[in-house]
Amino acid sequence: MEQLPSNLQVLLQAAEYVERREREAEHGYASILPCDPATPGRRKRQRTNSNPDNVRSVHNELEKHRRAQLRRCLEQLKQQVPLSMENSRHTTLSLLHRAKQHIKKLEDQELRAKSLKEKLRADQQKLRQRLKRLLPPNTERIRTDSLDSSNLSSERSDSDQEDLEVDVEGIILSGNEGELFVSFSAGLEHSYSTPAHAWL
């Protein structure tokens, strides 16, 4: 009979122990499992504790890269946007404001250039139609052919004359050849049939 109460007492103590451990686990005071440094739970906590440092370092590197890229873009923008000489130091806000004004100015210039181009194209078309009405049908073709042939002949004669001038001017005379050229220009008689006398 004494064994039964002892068994009940052991069961009650075990139940109280389990309840106490569960309450401590709910409030975060202790863990249900024993605290062993080699357990996977401890290693998992160590990894979770080190993860914020890794995330912070990655975030810092990305932020550093973003700022460097932003500085490069601002330097390129500063070279393309005309800045006033009033202040040697320009803030990012003033640079962006001037870039916006410069873009608006370029857009206005592009619109004016397009409208002028369309106007000139329309004027050119009107002039072509007027010229076509004023001239007979075959006159323009004959005139074009004559101009092309005259230009071609004049270009050929000019090129031939230039070749002759280059050939004459490009001669470099030595001592004997210079005397021969002077004697020939003075009117002395030289015969090509006796080349031995010509080179004396």
Swiss-Prot record:
Domain bHLH: 54-106
Function recorded in the entry: Transcriptional repressor. Binds with MAX to form a sequence-specific DNA-binding protein complex which recognizes the core sequence 5'-CAC[GA]TG-3'.
Protein name: Max dimerization protein 3
Source organism of the structure: Xenopus laevis
Gene Ontology molecular function, alphabetical: DNA-binding transcription factor activity, RNA polymerase II-specific; protein dimerization activity; RNA polymerase II cis-regulatory region sequence-specific DNA binding
Highest classification ranks of the organism: Eukaryota, Metazoa, Chordata, Craniata, Vertebrata
Source species, domain of life: Eukaryota
Keywords on record: DNA-binding, Nucleus, Repressor, Transcription, Transcription regulation
Annotated tissue distribution: Expressed broadly throughout the CNS and the eye, starting at neurula stages.
